[in-house]
Design a protein with these regions (language model features):
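N-terminal export leaders
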Residues: 6-11
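Bacterial Sec signal peptide processing site at the extreme N-terminus
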Residues: 19-38
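Acidic/histidine-rich, surface-exposed loop or edge segments in extracytoplasmic proteins
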Residues: 34-45, 127-131
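Post-signal-peptide N-terminal segment of Sec-exported extracytoplasmic proteins
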Residues: 43-74
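Sec/Tat-exported extracytoplasmic proteins
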Residues: 61-65, 103, 107, 150-159
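Surface-exposed short loop/turn segments
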Residues: 64-114, 122-138, 145
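C-terminal/domain-edge helix-coil "capping" segments
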Residues: 134-165
């Protein structure tokens, strides 16, 4: 058996259990999360963190003109010093964030899915004031992207329970 044939055989062997258990890709036609794409409107942002969150959610779910669902959210962030020098100067900060979110059916206003996601990022404050401000802004953007990805993952994972299309 050649190397190519062996790889093909192993690929088929790995795929068989997935087919046997009824595995369907989430975004496939008829898949549980297919109804999310280009059908979700995210509440308008009110600050930079909200803008970064909405931008990432729209990247992942698409921007819609005819929304079937709406995502509402509340962002909470805290900043704490992590790296402290012998002169009590903070050189590293940690930004922790949580988002409470709800997926709402536009037709009925029923809450289809809700949850809380959380994560953290860090940034260095040991450079110039300009680099510190830039690092902080980048850390906040990274945090919102992480949290948006967690929201989308949660919606995909639960879509089989609430998406009846």
């Amino acid at each position: 058996m050649s190397s190519y044939e062996r790889r093909r055989f192993l690929t088929v062997l790995v795929a068989l259990p997935l087919v046997a258990c009824g595995f369907t890709p989430a975004y496939a036609p008829g898949g549980p999360a297919a109804g999310l794409l280009d059908r979700v409107l995210v509440d308008a942002p009110t600050d930079k963190n909200g803008f970064d969150l909405v931008e990432r959610l729209e990247e992942r779910l698409g921007r819609t003109n005819a929304p079937a669902y709406r995502i509402s959210y509340a962002i909470k962030t805290t900043v704490e010093g992590q790296g402290i020098t012998t002169t009590n100067a903070v050189t590293r900060f940690r930004i922790s964030g949580t988002i409470d979110f709800a997926l709402i059916d536009n037709a009925t206003d029923a809450v289809l899915s809700r949850g809380t996601v959380g994560s953290f990022t860090s940034y260095s404050a040991s450079g110039t004031p300009v680099s510190t401000v830039s690092s902080e802004a980048d850390a906040n953007t990274r945090l919102m992207r992480l949290l948006a990805d967690q929201i989308v993952t949660r919606l995909i994972a639960t879509s089989g329970q609430w998406n009846q299309e």
